[in-house]
């Protein structure tokens, strides 16, 4: 009897007998069929772009301009808004037509990719080496593999430069730090000082250092893309025009599964970095679109109650809380004036709504008494009730469920999904790296079990 698992099932003319892989091994059946593998990749790209376009239009159709983006479960429109499309002062969405255009362009692109995927999967040549040698390859051809690596790096570099051109010449990008509560602006002076850009890479990832996640201005972000785009393009050209050195030929495993494992490791790292960026960073991920960070929501609550009680006559500089520490304000271990209460743990938070109230030694008491602007109060009150937490209780000094809004923050979605995906990709890297190394060593089929003692034991029944 034929089942899905006995190896006799044939899908697309590829069965376990002819390929060495069962149907559920997917593209492994196409390892040596470059034309069919091209079809799988193009079709996969079509699915990705189709999702982007369809989800984009879905978000546009459900978008309510009167509510904050982060309260509506949106994850794509915030990215478009961050690029400066359809946004006005203070992060207000004034035009959704660019978002509609983006969705339609992605859908049209996905149709082209989908057609290409179907064509190369079913109609085009099974292998490209004979008919299109430029696009053909053999996995063990080290020079060809580094040529392909170089082409990918060049395309990534161009992608980084597209953001630079958008920021410098094509309308600018949204800057949450623009005076008055954020605005779209042209980045006229991107950071090109290598000590600043590479200084982020040399920072500790812990505490207040934060590695590259600590970037806090658009000049550094765009300058970083100038560097990474240029390095990618130059590195791509290097890999296209050179051949691997002897030590790299010896050090790496040169097979399709090995390249898959390397790619999975790289995308795993990107997933973990994206997790941290989307959770902690409020410059690359402006809070106007993604909602406040955890520390930001906590500091917002302290600020909101300071404003309220100060209006009611409280002396916010000297009032004590139940622990004897300052109720509204206190000093950090280094002597800076910070917010008191549970939010003291987030004393090093930086946000565009709070920074104007700082002085040379932390929060400026005179500014807190005389210079608080209405937009700062409104934003803090909004952020206070939109902490990116799943907890219904007061955690870290943020609003309890009585005061909070019942929603899931885009930061929660993005950080959690990218952490999980990053983890799974890392496990997949270990799996495929182990298989690739085993195959290179000649024992990928596992240990011979013919003499396994278990096989000679009497059956239990």
From Swiss-Prot:
InterPro entries assigned: PS_antenna-like (IPR000932), PS_II_antenna-like_sf (IPR036001), PSII_PsbC (IPR005869), PSII_PsbC_sf (IPR044900)
Q: What does this protein do?
A: One of the components of the core complex of photosystem II (PSII). It binds chlorophyll and helps catalyze the primary light-induced photochemical processes of PSII. PSII is a light-driven water:plastoquinone oxidoreductase, using light energy to abstract electrons from H(2)O, generating O(2) and a proton gradient subsequently used for ATP formation.
Q: Which Pfam families match?
A: PSII
The cellular location(s) given in this protein's UniProt record come to: Plastid, Chloroplast thylakoid membrane
Q: What is this protein called?
A: Photosystem II CP43 reaction center protein
How does the annotation summarize its subunit structure? PSII is composed of 1 copy each of membrane proteins PsbA, PsbB, PsbC, PsbD, PsbE, PsbF, PsbH, PsbI, PsbJ, PsbK, PsbL, PsbM, PsbT, PsbX, PsbY, PsbZ, Psb30/Ycf12, at least 3 peripheral proteins of the oxygen-evolving complex and a large number of cofactors. It forms dimeric complexes.
What topology does the record note for this protein and the membrane? Multi-pass membrane protein
GO biological process entries? photosynthetic electron transport in photosystem II
Segments crossing the lipid bilayer: 57-81, 122-143, 166-188, 243-263, 279-300, 435-459
Propeptide residue numbers?
Answer: 1-2
Q: Which residues carry this modification: N-acetylthreonine?
A: 3
Kindly state what the record says about how the cofactor is bound.
Binds multiple chlorophylls and provides some of the ligands for the Ca-4Mn-5O cluster of the oxygen-evolving complex. It may also provide a ligand for a Cl- that is required for oxygen evolution. PSII binds additional chlorophylls, carotenoids and specific lipids.
Q: Family membership, please give it.
A: Belongs to the PsbB/PsbC family. PsbC subfamily.
- The superkingdom of the source organism is Eukaryota
List every position bearing Phosphothreonine: 3
Enumerate the UniProt keywords alphabetically.
Acetylation, Chlorophyll, Chloroplast, Chromophore, Manganese, Membrane, Metal-binding, Phosphoprotein, Photosynthesis, Photosystem II, Plastid, Thylakoid, Transmembrane, Transmembrane helix
User: What do the Gene Ontology cellular component annotations say?
Assistant: chloroplast thylakoid membrane; photosystem II
A molecular function annotated in GO for this UniProt entry is: metal ion binding
Residue positions binding [CaMn4O5] cluster: 355
SUPFAM superfamilies xrefs? Photosystem II antenna protein-like
């Amino acid at each position: 009897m034929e089942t899905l698992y006995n190896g006799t099932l044939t899908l697309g003319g590829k069965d376990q007998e002819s390929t060495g892989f069962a149907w559920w091994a997917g593209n492994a059946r196409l390892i040596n069929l470059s034309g069919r593998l091209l079809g799988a990749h193009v079709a996969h790209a079509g699915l990705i772009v189709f999702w982007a376009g369809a989800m984009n239009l879905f978000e546009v159709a459900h978008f309510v301009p009167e509510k904050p983006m982060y309260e509506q479960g949106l994850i794509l429109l915030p990215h478009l808004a961050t690029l400066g499309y359809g946004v006005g002062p203070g992060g207000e969405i004034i035009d959704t037509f660019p978002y509609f255009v983006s969705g339609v362009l992605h859908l049209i692109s996905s149709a082209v990719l989908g057609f290409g995927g179907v064509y190369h999967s079913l109609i085009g040549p099974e292998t490209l080496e004979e008919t299109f040698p430029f696009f053909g390859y053999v996995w063990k051809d080290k020079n060809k593999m580094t040529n392909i690596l170089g082409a990918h790096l060049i395309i990534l570099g161009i992608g980084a430069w597209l953001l630079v051109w958008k920021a410098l010449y094509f309308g600018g990008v949204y800057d949450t730090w623009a005076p008055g509560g954020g605005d779209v602006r042209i980045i006229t002076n991107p950071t090109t000082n290598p000590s600043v850009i590479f200084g982020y890479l040399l920072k500790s990832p812990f505490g207040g250092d934060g590695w590259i996640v600590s970037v806090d201005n658009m000049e550094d972000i765009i300058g970083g893309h100038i560097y990474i785009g240029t390095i990618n393009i130059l590195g791509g050209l290097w890999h296209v025009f050179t051949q691997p050195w002897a030590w790299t030929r010896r050090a790496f495993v040169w097979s399709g599964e090995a390249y898959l494992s390397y790619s999975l490791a790289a995308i795993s790292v990107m997933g973990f970095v994206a997790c941290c960026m989307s959770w902690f960073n409020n410059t690359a991920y402006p809070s106007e679109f993604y909602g406040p960070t955890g520390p930001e929501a906590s500091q917002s609550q302290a600020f909101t109650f300071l404003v309220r009680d100060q209006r009611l006559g409280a002396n916010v500089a000297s009032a004590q809380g139940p622990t004897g520490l300052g109720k509204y304000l206190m000093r950090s271990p280094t002597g800076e004036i910070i917010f008191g209460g549970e939010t003291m743990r987030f004393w090093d938070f930086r946000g565009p709504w709070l920074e104007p109230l700082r002085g040379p030694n932390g929060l400026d008491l005179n500014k807190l008494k005389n210079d608080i602007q209405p937009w700062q109060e409104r934003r803090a009150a909004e952020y206070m009730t939109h902490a990116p937490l799943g907890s219904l209780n007061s955690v870290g000094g943020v609003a309890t469920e009585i005061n909070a809004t019942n929603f899931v923050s885009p930061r929660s979605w993005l950080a959690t999904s990218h952490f999980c995906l990053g983890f799974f990709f890392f496990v997949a890297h270990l799996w495929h790296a182990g298989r690739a190394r085993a195959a290179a060593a000649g024992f990928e089929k596992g240990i011979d079990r013919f003499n396994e003692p278990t096989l000679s034991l009497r059956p239990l029944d």
